């Protein structure tokens, strides 16, 4: 399983290619040769459209580097190097403009279909184009599910319950309004308005109604009811440890790779012309102050 966090944790002084190469040397099985690992990195770079920036530094607060979308794709490449069957992403489009976000979702969709990999992502306020790229949707309100099924069927589902938009709007915007109880532009079943409830009570009533309808639907045998027999915890742990040992390099190889990565990352910082000038200037100033 791979997990891509919302904030990209990468070394700013390393290039995109160096980041993925060091990750490959650390995470890919020891039985693979160095050339095979480099070939795997080249394939990932091509798959994620990172060819143009492969020799560009990641960058950070004080280092100019790649764009936000390229940095996010590098983080994704870091995780899919080991070819996980399940990839989780925490709000991958946050902080990206609409064009970069759409390109990223297109790449994720291509990865899911070409490698038959399951990709699960949390996302806020996707555009209409992005929304229609999703296969399945899980909508959560106040920690409880109110819809789980095919993304293209969600509007019909809520319409059958009596919830329809009163103005043309993005399906994702409609769903988020439902989940948060923002019902100004949404028609709701009349029975929920009985007694002219206060706004807060009305929102709570609608959310509770949607949660109850989802539970009823799941209880009637909705999607995902068939379950595989679960392994015992001890068996799962032994299997995970065995798979980890099969994939890991030994501690000395890890030490060598980490040392090389640290030197490569810090050397560019320590040997920066501005830093050298500052160090020499401070040394000369202190030497003159204490000159006898």
Predicted segments — roles?
Residues 101-116:
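Helical segment within the ABC ATPase nucleotide-binding domain
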Residues 50, 56-74, 98:
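ABC ATPase nucleotide-binding domain "signature motif"
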Residues 7-18, 31-32, 83:
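Conserved catalytic motifs of ABC-family nucleotide-binding domains
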Residues 79-80:
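ABC ATPase C-loop
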Residues 116, 123-156:
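H-loop (His-switch) and adjacent beta-strand-loop-beta switch element
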Residues 87-91:
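Catalytic Walker B motif of ABC-type/P-loop ATPase nucleotide-binding domains
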Residues 5, 22, 27-48, 54, ...:
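Topological signature of polytopic alpha-helical transporters
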